[in-house]
């Protein structure tokens, strides 16, 4: 009988958190975000933010989770 592998959730250490300002709203709930470090990132809204109808407008400060594998895209997880 083969051993069962444990399913692992994405750990917090797998993502990088960053803050930025929404510059532009694009189609399909995608946004262009300017990070505090000066980089531009394409970001989408996380599932919980969609469920709770949290609106994001240009000029809002947001917190992003960025994957270390593709640093040009991210997920918006919090609006300040």
Swiss-Prot record:
The gene is infA. One of the essential components for the initiation of protein synthesis. Stabilizes the binding of IF-2 and IF-3 on the 30S subunit to which N-formylmethionyl-tRNA(fMet) subsequently binds. Helps modulate mRNA selection, yielding the 30S pre-initiation complex (PIC). Upon addition of the 50S ribosomal subunit IF-1, IF-2 and IF-3 are released leaving the mature 70S translation initiation complex. Residues 6-80 form the S1-like domain. It comes from Deinococcus geothermalis (strain DSM 11300 / CIP 105573 / AG-3a). It is found in: Cytoplasm. NCBIfam families: infA (TIGR00008). InterPro entries: NA-bd_OB-fold, RNA-binding_domain_S1_IF1, TIF_IF1. Signal peptide: none annotated. Disulfide bonds: none annotated. One of its GO terms (cellular component) is cytosol. Its main location: cytoplasm. Coiled coil: none annotated. SUPFAM superfamilies: Nucleic acid-binding proteins. Keywords: Cytoplasm, Initiation factor, Protein biosynthesis, RNA-binding, rRNA-binding. Belongs to the IF-1 family. The keyword Cytoplasm applies. Transmembrane segments: none annotated. This is Translation initiation factor IF-1. Component of the 30S ribosomal translation pre-initiation complex which assembles on the 30S ribosome in the order IF-2 and IF-3, IF-1 and N-formylmethionyl-tRNA(fMet); mRNA recruitment can occur at any time during PIC assembly. One of its GO terms (molecular function) is translation initiation factor activity.
């Amino acid at each position: 009988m083969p051993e069962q592998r444990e399913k692992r959730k994405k750990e917090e250490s797998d993502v990088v958190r960053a803050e930025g300002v929404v510059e532009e709203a694009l189609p399909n709930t995608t946004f262009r975000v300017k990070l505090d470090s000066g980089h531009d990132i394409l970001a989408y809204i996380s599932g919980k933010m969609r469920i709770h109808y949290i609106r994001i407008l240009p000029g809002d400060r947001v917190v992003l989770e960025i994957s270390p594998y593709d640093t040009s895209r991210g997920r918006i997880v919090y609006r300040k």
